[in-house]
């Protein structure tokens, strides 16, 4: 369970745990593929039901911006791992600073290295959520 924070793996210590937990809970109940963006304990963007994780991310970012939310310092949850670092890179370019995802990709190290180089936080929950 995501509420058991001691089971999460923190890649950096600069995360906003409350926003990450909220985003993960929302992602659990959202149609896959989904990306959830939270800030200050509120949902500010969601992308769901997309074929690709990048499409879900772009949908969530665009919705956030359309409704006037500032993404600087926001948190993001994904219902599945990132097979490449592309979503992490797009998130960073848009101001997102912390991410929670299940982990388990053969290329997790690419995302970890990008986060470390750019002072982002990333947590691995070890839990995949798929709702089709």
Kindly label every feature range from the protein language model.
Residues 1-11:
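Single conserved hydrophobic/aromatic residue that forms the stacking wall/gate
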Residues 9-10, 19-25, 30-34:
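Active-site loops and adjacent core secondary-structure elements that bind or stabilize anionic groups
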Residues 42-89:
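Glycine- and Gly-Pro-enriched alpha-helical subdomains that act as flexible
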Residues 89-132:
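C-terminal binding/interaction regions
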């Amino acid at each position: 369970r995501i509420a058991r924070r001691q089971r999460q793996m923190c890649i950096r210590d600069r995360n906003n745990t409350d926003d990450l937990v909220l985003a993960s809970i929302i992602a659990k109940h959202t149609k896959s593929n989904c990306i959830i963006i939270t800030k200050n304990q509120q949902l500010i963007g969601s992308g769901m039901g997309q074929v690709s994780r990048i499409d879900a991310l772009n949908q969530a970012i665009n919705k956030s911006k359309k409704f006037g939310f500032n993404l600087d310092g926001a948190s993001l949850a994904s219902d599945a791992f990132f097979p490449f670092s592309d979503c992490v890179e797009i998130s960073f370019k848009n101001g997102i600073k912390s991410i929670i995802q299940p982990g388990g990709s053969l290329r997790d190290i690419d995302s970890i290295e990008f986060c470390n180089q750019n002072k982002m936080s990333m947590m691995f929950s070890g839990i995949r959520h798929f709702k089709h």
